[in-house]
Amino acid sequence: MLLRTCAVLLCTASIAELTLAEELTTATDPLPQGTFTTWDHSDQWKIKNALAAAPDFISEHATVVDWVDPGIAGKLDMGRVLRKGTNGWTCMPDIPGRPQHDPMCADEPMMEILMDIIGGRTPTVKKVGLSYMLLGEARQGQGAGPAKDPREVKEWFYIGPHIMVALPAESVSALDGINQDLKNGLPYTSLLNPKVNVPIWVIPVKRSGERIH
């Protein structure tokens, strides 16, 4: 009887492990057509998803920070620290409501910019800020604000794996004249947030739908 009970417990544990492993594969697999990223995942899933945004030599020692449940907060905001890091980089899982994975890993200057924007403050960029999005992202277009319902967005622009560079305020004129077309796959300039005049230089390293790793 004892052996049978142990066997059942081991079997149950194995099934649970397989279920978790199967779920974790969805952290980086392409989203099924017609679905959107959500906040409702396990911490392990979010960590795996977030760390996929940057090269291993950066992500393996990065801090991972979750978003606050948008259904509760009513807006995008930083939440719990899921894992503490040591190298000054911070990785975040998917932003909910996007038609493809879009985790990001940012260095300290870029995180200062992001925190200012989320907090409703005008960023004062004093250093070059850098971030990785190696799973790519989907954007609503130049100057478009976040949609309340992603199903109502008429056209998404899919950007392949890329890095983003934010320049100090006194140097942003260096981005003048650079491509602003999101469709041609070339590096382009955009605003990090349509309400804040902080231009960034987005540099794709793969085509949309392609992966680095």
Regions found by a protein language model. Give the residues of each.
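Primary mode marks residue(s) on the alpha4-beta5-alpha5 output face of response regulator receiver
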Residues: 23-213
